[in-house]
Amino acid sequence: MTKAWEKNIRKVVPYVPGEQPNKERMIKLNTNENPYPPAPGVAEALKNLDPDRLRLYPDPACIRLVNAIAKQKGLKSEQVFVGVGSDDVLAMCFMTFFNSDKPVLFPDISYSFYSVWADLYRIPYETPALNDKFEIVPEDYFKENGGVIFPNPNAPTALHMDLEKVEEIIRHNQDVVVIVDEAYIDFDGRSARELVHKYDNLLVVQTFSKSRSMAGMRIGYAFGNKDLIKALNDVKFSFNSYTMNAPTLAYGVAAVEDDAYFKECVEKIKNKIGRASCRERV
């Protein structure tokens, strides 16, 4: 058999997911999972799920979950897109928005999946270096490019960029899409959510995996200008209409609706992080 297909993937170095050891009584830190269980409403939704519903295809538009997220974020439903974890959403973003001959810009020390997607989709990219304090330098993103993406807070440095600096990057790149990856925003920093009404080129991506304790459910979402969301849906419906299964959609709605529990768990984690930081300094 000829292997003509190899030329499409032979240069790709795949992302290495975190190990999931099958051992009891282990403190697992390698993939930053939440130590607290999901909201009680999620367990209730699991208990009340009608098995007969599983014979039907799930809602391809994920309307109930989209509406719940939009309401919680103070947005319109047409401004929200959901996917199978933020990795799925981000991969679709690379496919949808980063298709010019100009390089996409993202930090040299950052989420390692960015370069994997760029290589897989043959997207040129450049990786501006962090400064000597491991901070993103906004001015490095003012040059001509085919799009910008960065995490805030950054991973793995855990440093967040002030919203004013985030806006500087967006303001200097209004001809391309700027994606702010906010997987950890609930633990530190200000979300760029308040800027989506001001800039139609801004897309913010978040996840249920960290602050909402649902890494096993795989729910991620993006919000921004309705035209960006429509473009993402056009790509999604071009290859897989049913990306999210019915149980996951139900659990996601239950998680969003229990905002008090979510905030309580986030505060507990932030307090523990603060105590750990104090011990390090001592």
What are the language-model segments listed below?
Residues 32-35, 86-87, 111, 152-156, ...:
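Short glycine-rich anion-binding loops that position phosphate/pyrophosphate groups of nucleotides
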Residues 63-103:
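Phosphate-binding glycine-rich loop
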Residues 280-282:
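Positively charged, low-complexity/disordered segments
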Residues 133-144, 156-178, 182-214:
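Active-site pre-lysine segment of PLP-dependent enzymes
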Residues 201-277:
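PLP-dependent aminotransferase class I/II
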